[in-house]
A protein has these predicted regions:
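Active-site beta->alpha loop and helix N-cap motifs at the rims of alpha/beta catalytic domains
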Residues: 1-101
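Catalytic alpha/beta core domains of metabolic enzymes, predominantly
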Residues: 42-52, 84-220
Length: 220
């Protein structure tokens, strides 16, 4: 997965060679946050959305031609000034930041999409994901969701924080893939993720869909 920030041109190139490209709605077209307070009229706001669409659609076309999937990965800490000025630093703003791009994907009939919404604040992360599921259902969208808590830390604290955020959503039946992020060796993250998934899988009504490696996948 190519993780691209700040430069949509890099995302275009990455889509030619990578199986999946992650973009961050907060800095894909909107400039980096400067914490500037600016009120947008509805007309001005619509113009900004049009700029996103004009830049995002060519990227989707490259992905279509090369069978490249994308992940729309929203970070609580990198919401654009435009979103923050209209919605504040809220779950509603986080969700709208994601939906702006999802609506374009739906309009362009592009569905090789995975979504992630991450925050170091587990309350914000859980509320945002629950709200996103509600809004997607209203708009007839159904995309896989990737769960994770950023900056969870290490040791017992990091494991508890990950369990609170990811576990709460899995218990709701929300989430298709998970990533536990610890400030430790990457191998230490895997047992924690497996334990969470196994625990939820044992609960009544939470049947897991087992993952299988693609036959032609080269693990090297």
């Amino acid at each position: 997965v190519a993780d691209v920030h700040f430069n949509p041109n890099v995302a275009d190139v990455a889509a030619l060679y990578c199986e999946k490209v992650r973009i961050n709605p907060g800095n894909y077209v909107d400039p980096a946050r400067k914490f500037i307070k600016q009120e947008y009229t509805d007309e001005e706001y619509a113009h900004e959305l049009k700029k996103i669409e004009e830049r995002f659609v060519p990227f989707l076309n490259i992905c279509k031609e090369n069978h490249t999937a994308i992940r729309i990965g929203v970070n609580h800490g990198s919401l654009s000034d435009r979103i923050r000025n209209r919605y504040g630093d809220t779950p509603e703003g986080i969700v709208e930041s994601c939906l702006e791009f999802l609506r374009i994907c739906k309009k362009e009939n592009f569905h090789d999409v995975v979504i992630s919404i991450k925050s170091s604040n587990t309350v914000v992360m859980v509320r945002s994901m629950r709200l996103l599921v509600e809004e997607m259902e209203k708009e007839g969208m159904n995309y896989p969701l990737h769960l994770g808590v950023t900056e969870a830390g290490e040791g017992e604290d990091g494991r508890i924080k990950s369990a609170v955020g990811i576990g709460a959503l899995l218990a709701d039946g929300i989430g298709d893939t998970v990533r536990v992020s610890l400030s430790e060796e990457p191998a230490a993250e895997i047992p924690v993720a497996r334990h969470l998934v196994d625990y939820i899988g044992k609960k009544q009504g939470h049947l897991l869909i087992p993952a299988a490696a693609y036959p032609g996948f080269d693990w090297l």
